[in-house]
């Protein structure tokens, strides 16, 4: 009886390793558009969360991320921006700065202002296409906070798949529900931004390693 149980456990373990290997292989095969980008700058393009609202100077996630990738990261966060307002400054803040990777973080203010998800999605799609046309990689952040804004997660994930962009999941998960990690109802504090930077780094690092800029 004990022997049979041990054999069964070994089989289950082997199947688990096999499924994990398949999953990792699938991730490794996913191609990102402009993986060979000749751009020079990593740019974080977003709203008050990218700006670092609620934290002290130097605690914003682009600054923390810069230390992780050992390269400059340009912070192009503007307090209160919606995805539509972002389009108006896309050229001067992003496209004219020789981007090689742009991390896009919008949607929170669209949600708060009750802008239809279809409009936010259309704006995000335009942002993606313009950045990719400039020869840069694009990473879209999942700004859904645990159970709210799940429609944004689904829509942004769809856009990433359609345009071969990097999807950064669960940016705020466990942060806005934890008083020790947030400065108010909508913004992290320094510790919260550190977690966000770590999540972004984990998502983009495999693609950075394939590009000569950060080798």
Task: Write out the residue ranges for each language-model feature.
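Alpha-helical cap/lid subdomain in secreted, periplasmic
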Residues: 2-5, 36, 64-68, 88-215
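Residues at secondary-structure transition points
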Residues: 22-24, 52, 58, 83, ...
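Conserved Rossmann-like nucleotide-binding pocket used by diverse enzymes
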Residues: 23, 74, 139
């Amino acid at each position: 009886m004990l022997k049979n149980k041990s054999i069964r456990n070994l089989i289950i373990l082997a199947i688990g390793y096999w499924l994990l290997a398949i999953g990792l292989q699938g991730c490794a095969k996913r191609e990102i558009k402009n993986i060979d980008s000749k751009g020079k700058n990593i740019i974080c393009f977003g709203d008050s969360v990218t700006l670092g609202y609620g934290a002290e100077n130097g605690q914003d996630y682009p600054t923390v991320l810069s230390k992780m990738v050992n390269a400059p990261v340009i912070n192009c966060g503007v307090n209160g921006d919606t995805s539509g307002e972002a389009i108006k400054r896309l050229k001067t803040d992003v496209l004219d700065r020789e981007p090689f990777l742009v991390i896009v973080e919008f949607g929170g203010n669209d949600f708060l202002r009750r802008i239809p998800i279809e409009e936010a999605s259309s704006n995000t799609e335009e942002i993606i296409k313009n950045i990719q046309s400039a020869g840069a990689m694009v990473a879209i952040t999942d700004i859904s906070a645990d159970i709210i804004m799940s429609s944004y997660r689904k829509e942004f994930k769809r856009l990433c798949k359609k345009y071969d962009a990097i999807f950064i999941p669960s940016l705020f998960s466990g942060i806005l529900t934890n008083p020790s990690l947030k400065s108010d109802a909508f913004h992290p504090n320094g510790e919260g931004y550190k977690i966000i930077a770590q999540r972004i780094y984990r998502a983009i690092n495999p693609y950075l390693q394939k590009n000569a800029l950060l080798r």
